[in-house]
Amino acid sequence: MKYQVVIGLEVHTQLTTNTKIFCGCSTRFGAEPNSQTCPVCLGLPGALPVLNRQVVEYAIRAGLATNCSITQRNVFARKNYFYPDLPKGYQISQFDLPICQHGHLDIDLEGERKRIGITRIHMEEDAGKLVHADIPGVDDSCVDLNRACTPLLEIVSEPDMRSPDEAIAYLKKLHQIVMYLGICDGNLEEGSFRCDANVSLMPVGSNVFGTRAELKNINSFKFIKQAIEYEIERQAEILDDGGKVIQETRLFDPNTGTTRSMRGKEEAHDYRYFPDPDLVPVIISDDWIERVRGELPELPEAKRARFMSELSLPEYDAEVLAASRELAQYFEDTFALFPQAKTVSNWVMGEVTRALNDDNNRSIAECPVTPALLADLLKLMEKGTISGKIAKTVFDEMYKTGKAPEKIVEEKGLVQVSDTGAIEAMIDEVLEKNAGQVAEYRGGKETLFGFFVGQVMRASKGKANPGVVNEMLLKKLQG
């Protein structure tokens, strides 16, 4: 490609506070339209905002986790524009004094590490939502102000990404971090984590950025990548034809995989920012910052490294387990009761994840098999009470019923047979019924050994101890 792609991202994360940023209304998703509003949300004359302290705390968390410096004197500003879902005629945000600045995240892609700068993180309120009626013959749009005044952090990256894959790697890492911090539920479909992408092209070798287009409010990683890829092609075609890219805001259409013009792109001065006279500056002390720093959870990258260094887990296992804070906690809780890291990892990534996926993609928090129950099952397998194959059957029953593994094994008579006399009798019966195959095996066709093992296990209904079966069967066939 003769053009260098330049991408910067603006990510809006909706915070998991119970109430809004400047009033006491609920932030619960899915309520009846306009049922979670008050004079502040509605922008009524004389209504005064009161800052939610937890929003500031969450912003400090986000800043520390993304290597930002924390601004100790914070000022809120009014961002002035007119839109039907913005009843006040302005949005309360931050302008020249954002709460977090000069951070970075490191991404890993194809074995290489790259640092993506974070320009700023600032606190702001969300706007309402326009609902377009899907009724034949009705062209009206409705306004739902439940979302108005909901707390957001806007996380603005430097234009450091040079491909759609780098953008997605950065987004996924940021998504993982805000969920680990517990400040955002990360739900892209509900708009809790949404992204605007600024995309431009410049000639290879140049250090002067091209004219950018902003792609608005894209709510899935797949669509973000598609939107950026399309925009790169669109701009390259314009430049190849000798045209000029217009600075504008564009909307992505997931049905066609294309973007379309929405409006001309505004500059900061178009919003006529000025300090909000109804909100005093917020002073963040060193003690407050250090307290929040001390309460930060172990973040994904550190957890992944610890799983590999202290528990000797393979990189793949560590990556999968550390991807979700809840999954990692489930693994660690099980490991605390059954300290065999690789065995626990195999079961969590295998049977546990499979069962949850098959059950309408339930979350690990909803898993009916608790870490304690899973540890009990693994102990039965370790003691030789049940085989690995039977353990999977027992797990499925545990998932369905929530019963303890010991009870299921007892009720269904699944105790593993290790009695050498009983196993020898089964082996003798199998060899007698398959005399022809025995002759072939002894004639050099040793691949038949697995066939004999399978026949013995079938005769025992899966209860025979595989280790004992293998050892005794080998002696019989060699003798």
UniProtKB/Swiss-Prot annotation:
In the UniProt record, the signal sequence range is none
Primary gene name: gatB
Q: Which family does it belong to?
A: Belongs to the GatB/GatE family. GatB subfamily.
Q: Which GO terms describe its biological process?
A: glutaminyl-tRNAGln biosynthesis via transamidation; translation
Q: Does the keyword Ligase apply?
A: yes
Q: Catalyses which reaction? A: L-glutamyl-tRNA(Gln) + L-glutamine + ATP + H2O = L-glutaminyl-tRNA(Gln) + L-glutamate + ADP + phosphate + H(+); L-aspartyl-tRNA(Asn) + L-glutamine + ATP + H2O = L-asparaginyl-tRNA(Asn) + L-glutamate + ADP + phosphate + 2 H(+)
Task: Output the NCBIfam families linked to this UniProt entry.
Answer: gatB, PRK05477.1-2, PRK05477.1-4, PRK05477.1-5
Instruction: Give its E.C. classification number.
Output: 6.3.5.-
- List keywords of the entry alphabetically: ATP-binding, Ligase, Nucleotide-binding, Protein biosynthesis
InterPro entries assigned to the protein according to its UniProt record, in alphabetical order: Asn/Gln-tRNA_amidoTrfase_suB/E (IPR017959), Asn/Gln-tRNA_Trfase_suB/E_cat (IPR006075), Asn/Gln_amidotransferase (IPR018027), Asn/Gln_tRNA_amidoTrase-B-like (IPR003789), GatB (IPR004413), GatB_C_1 (IPR042114), GatB_Yqey_C_2 (IPR023168), Gln-tRNA_amidoTrfase_suB_CS (IPR017958)
What is its quaternary makeup?
Heterotrimer of A, B and C subunits.
For this UniProt entry, the molecular function terms from Gene Ontology, in alphabetical order, are:
asparaginyl-tRNA synthase (glutamine-hydrolyzing) activity; ATP binding; glutaminyl-tRNA synthase (glutamine-hydrolyzing) activity
The enzyme's main class, written as a single word, is ligase
Superkingdom is Bacteria
| Disulfide-linked positions | none
An example Pfam family from this entry, by short name, is GatB_Yqey
Q: What does this protein do?
A: Allows the formation of correctly charged Asn-tRNA(Asn) or Gln-tRNA(Gln) through the transamidation of misacylated Asp-tRNA(Asn) or Glu-tRNA(Gln) in organisms which lack either or both of asparaginyl-tRNA or glutaminyl-tRNA synthetases. The reaction takes place in the presence of glutamine and ATP through an activated phospho-Asp-tRNA(Asn) or phospho-Glu-tRNA(Gln).
Q: What SUPFAM superfamilies does the record point to?
A: GatB/YqeY motif (SSF89095), Glutamine synthetase/guanido kinase (SSF55931)
> What protein name does the entry list?
Aspartyl/glutamyl-tRNA(Asn/Gln) amidotransferase subunit B
